[in-house]
Amino acid sequence: MTPTPLRVLLSAVGVAAAAHLARADAPSQDRAAPAAARVDDLMRRLTQEEKLSLLGGDRDFYIRPVPRLGIPEIKMADGPLGVRNYGPSTAYPATIGLAASWDPDLAREFGAAVGSDARARGVHIMLGPAVNINRVPRNGRNFEYLSEDPYLAGAVAAQIVAGIQIQGVVATVKHFAANNQETDRGTIDARVSERALREIYLPAFRAAVEQGHAWAVMCAYNRLNGSYCSANDWLNNRVLKGDWAFKGVLMSDWGAAHDTPGVANGGLDLEMPSGRFMNPGALGPLIASGQISQATIDDKVRRILTLEVANGFLDRPQLLSSTPKDDPRSAAVALKVAREAIVLLKNDHGALPITGKKLRRIVVLGPNAAGLPAGGGSAHVEPFHYVSVVDGLKRVVGRKVKIDAIPGPGPELLRSLLAKTTFEGPLKLEFMTFDWENRKEIAAVTDTRIDHDWDAGAPAPVVDAADYTARWTGAIRAPATGRFIFMVQNHGFVTVKLDGRTLISSWANPNDALFAEAPLEAGRPYAVEVMAHHDNQGPAGIHFAWGAAPPTLTDDQAARVRAADAVVVCVGFNAMLEGEGADRAYELPNDQPELILRAAELNPRTIVVVNSGGVVATADWIGKVPALLQAWYPGQEGGRAVADVLVGAVNPSGKLPISYEKRREDSPSYGHYPGSGGTVDYAEGILVGYRGFDTKGVAPLYPFGYGLSYTTFSYDKLHVEPTQDGRWAVTFDVTNNGAQGGDEVSEVYVSPPVTSKAGRPVRELRGFSREHLATDQTMTVTVVLDRHAFSYYDEAKRDWVVEPGSYTVEVGASSRNILLAGAVDLN
């Protein structure tokens, strides 16, 4: 029957009335209601089963929905360097490079771009930033972190968080706390004094929570002073939720929970990736017996619901389909960060920028010249496209200058080695389920080579084509003593082991070839294991080969290097060699030092570009080259940024967020890493990084806060004056004395009174300012210090204390280049 207008009107009135009644009965659905009232309503309506189910993650990266109450499924994504897990995305520079910009405004811009990319994929929660202190130079995740200094790390972290969350996406600050090495990270007990925690390892987290207003914190895998971080009552309940009044959600790292009562009472709100210990079956009996209180459970549920309601997740779609996934605005931010991140460490005799009317040919060589160098693990992002250093130079120099690329080992070498690769007898090939924790063998056969293209099909009739692990085991025998290269091409995660030692462990791009070198003895058998994982992310197949390592440079390549007007050697690490799960080597890998030395021998105009998350050994070659750039992992636009700096289109302005020691033994943590017997003792206490170098009088190769420019700056006219609100204004002039505009980072340090009995560092960073100055421009800069800038943590008083006496306020261009000094008397 066709409805009459009256029926339509009555129907509309009925719907409106029903909607009004629904809002009255369910304040949780009333967008105009306060968040607390909406959460109260949801708490009343949730069943106990639903409450307990919310405390464990679902399908790896989700929080469970409650559809009947309008509570949506909440989607998460790694990580700190861009949106991972859901296909290609903008690959930003490593955040240690962002910290090297000393630019909090840029950090906020970076966070906002990441948040926008997240909305383009319907992501509610980003699992970043990562803000642990760079204590150990070899830490595999240093590239994800920010600095050895807590003030700089906190200033950058707070703005990343604010930027992400301004887009309607939750930021997750990780890894809480003292997760400063990957070696034994799942079990190691970090023994750290409360003073060192309060002064060094916790301030960046505190800044992210109190200044950035982070909605989520992720606990670390390790133990801290005896207790796993996921169940550490002092860390989670007293400090985070007590002292800092954190109202958000504390989640576990993936698989970091170890028992139900420990994590429930120890402050954990959400177990990820699933509720192995935080589920109705495990929690229910403990609540009934009184081991876990209902109030404890309700607090966790309330925190999760408050996060969801306050961030609008119940009221709007999270997906912004109008935002492109490959967003040129995000790419522009990635380029800006990459440019500001680059630190010019050495520039003798004006080797840089590469300019001149007679410039005709630049040779670019090294393993990172033509690819995308990036750190590995959960922070690794696969971009839609990228610009290599070779590509970047070709773009900026035009047709008048030839860019002569000499690539490192790649697919072409792999193909030539495949025909020569042999094994000692047949290989055992096992197929297993893809489940990382509980692999089950499906089938076992023999194979004669590892050279297969399975595409979308199954490698064996009984194997699921979408999800499987294949493992080959066998032996090889070297025909001669010398260095040999091992190469593999795969789509997915792949590991290669030689006599039990891991040579390759990385996600692989099917268009590239991973490689590692190792010395072998003639006639000796070596056990080989190759394991490849396929998880339906692309065509399946694997190609593995080994053979004699190629020469550092062929005769033809050497001639090209000798004849070049400039040589750029791109060295460092990559996703296979530096990343989550293991700490990296201190020395440059494979034959990279020999490559630098050979290039420098052939051509004195050799410039080195290093990609790494931190310090690398330089003693063997630093005296042989005139120029050195620390480019970190510069992201998808990194090749263009490096090229811009090399040719002078961009004036380098980055400054080290870490200290660059001359040798590994000089690091304050040396001798207190990686620990033994399941424990690592942070015996250096608060003397981390430059605090240790300066206090103990050890000269670094390049100090904290150091970075050269193509122009020069001078400092003058320091004034330190009290303000009406009890703070101190540090005012000084900075002048650009050179012929090129540039950015300068001015650093403000505080030194304790000479009468101090508190065992304080010689100086500590307490403020900074980044400014752009045109040629001959003078700018007056003011940095304001609050009372906390003069305090230390007194363990006996369990409080921050300001000692009476005369403090020195220092202004400089690095921790070892103090240019101005004044005094503040606190009596």
Where are these regions (language model features)?
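Flexible, membrane-facing loop/turn or short amphipathic-helix motifs
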Residues: 795-796
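Bacterial N-terminal signal peptides that target proteins for export
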Residues: 1-10
